[in-house]
Amino acid sequence: MSNATKFGKVAVLLGGKSAERAVSLDSGQAVLDALLRSGVQAEAFDPQNRSVTELVNYDRAFIVLHGRGGEDGQIQGVLEWLNIPYTGTGVQGSAIGMDKVKTKQIWQGSDLPTAPYRIITKETDLDSVIAELGLPVIIKPVHEGSSVGMSKVEKAEDFAAAIEKATQHDAVVMAEKWITGREFTISFLNGQPLPVIRLQPPADVAFYDYEAKYQRNDVEYGIPCGLSETEEKKLQALCLRAFQAVGAEGWGRIDAMQDEQGNFWLLEVNTVPGMTSHSLVPKAAKAVGYSFDELCVAILDQTLEGTA
């Protein structure tokens, strides 16, 4: 690629210290290989093993750090301080996007439909949660991605164990109303929605969990997604509003449900989605003609905005 030199020296930020380190290493290696194939002068940079001050030796950064430390505004803040352009969402949008409760609060304040929820503390009366949300519910750590620490609870007696599992990953835990229906994911490139993908985990999987996302090969990905053209455009428009409401930029992903009455519900936003062979953004981009290598270069192109 003749114009790859315009990027200068690129740090591909991968690994890190979060619960999603293994996924980030896989994603980061895939991105690194793609950039190198495209002629970009790119190098792997793992903040767990190197001081972030060494980033001053690079012209820009491609962030493929998933979870805390990489997706929550921390590394974005460091890069802002060092005046190094980087891919994706900025400090504030990243911090909001990593916090499932803050995300929901912003969506609710913007009149965007998101599943009802309750924050769970040691003092919370679980019977009142069940009375409010019904069963089943899904228990989630508020600040984790990749479905880490999540459980579906169908019986009241399983509530405590699910909360215990979630608190191993985060001090803040939430219960969210379970929405029965079809799950969709909407990817973004250059701030615009790509074709919707329908997710169909196998029957023995309660939801699109960590194993389904990264380890199983029997998850079905529907492109086209099975929605009518009108419905797909409606969902894309809804998710674009949701993406912009939290301050997300560039590339990312929003997960949503359609209930049995046909209503759409926003679940969460992902500001640094996976880029592995199982990942959803590459699948959506492929549907509109992007190879994986072209996708990675297009994401990196965002770092040139305002510098030309």
Swiss-Prot record:
Gene Ontology terms describing biological process? cell wall organization; peptidoglycan biosynthetic process; regulation of cell shape
CC annotations in GO: cytosol
InterPro entries in the cross-refs: ATP-grasp, D-Ala_lig_Van_CS, D_ala_D_ala, Dala_Dala_lig_C, Dala_Dala_lig_N, PreATP-grasp_dom_sf
Q: Record-annotated residues binding Mg(2+) 1?
A: D255, E268
Give the ATP-grasp domain ranges: 104-301
Q: Does the keyword Amino-acid biosynthesis apply?
A: no
Pfam families, alphabetized: Dala_Dala_lig_C, Dala_Dala_lig_N
Q: In which pathway does it act?
A: Cell wall biogenesis; peptidoglycan biosynthesis
Q: Which residues bind Mg(2+) 2?
A: E268, N270
Gene Ontology molecular function: ATP binding; D-alanine-D-alanine ligase activity; metal ion binding
Quote the EC number: 6.3.2.4
Give the required cofactors: Mg(2+); Mn(2+)
What does the record give as the reaction this protein catalyses?
2 D-alanine + ATP = D-alanyl-D-alanine + ADP + phosphate + H(+)
Task: Return the cofactor note field.
Answer: Binds 2 magnesium or manganese ions per subunit.
Give the subcellular location. Cytoplasm
First-level EC class: ligase
Q: Is this entry keyworded ATP-binding? A: yes
The alphabetized UniProt keywords are: ATP-binding, Cell shape, Cell wall biogenesis/degradation, Cytoplasm, Ligase, Magnesium, Manganese, Metal-binding, Nucleotide-binding, Peptidoglycan synthesis
Q: Binding residues for ATP, per the UniProt record?
A: 130-185
The protein's matches in PANTHER family, at most eight in alphabetical order, are given as: D-ALANINE--D-ALANINE LIGASE, D-ALANINE--D-ALANINE LIGASE B
Q: What does this protein do?
A: Cell wall formation.
Family to which this protein belongs? Belongs to the D-alanine--D-alanine ligase family.
The protein's name is: D-alanine--D-alanine ligase
Q: Which organism is it from?
A: Acinetobacter baumannii (strain AYE)
In the UniProt record, what gene is named as encoding this protein?
ddl
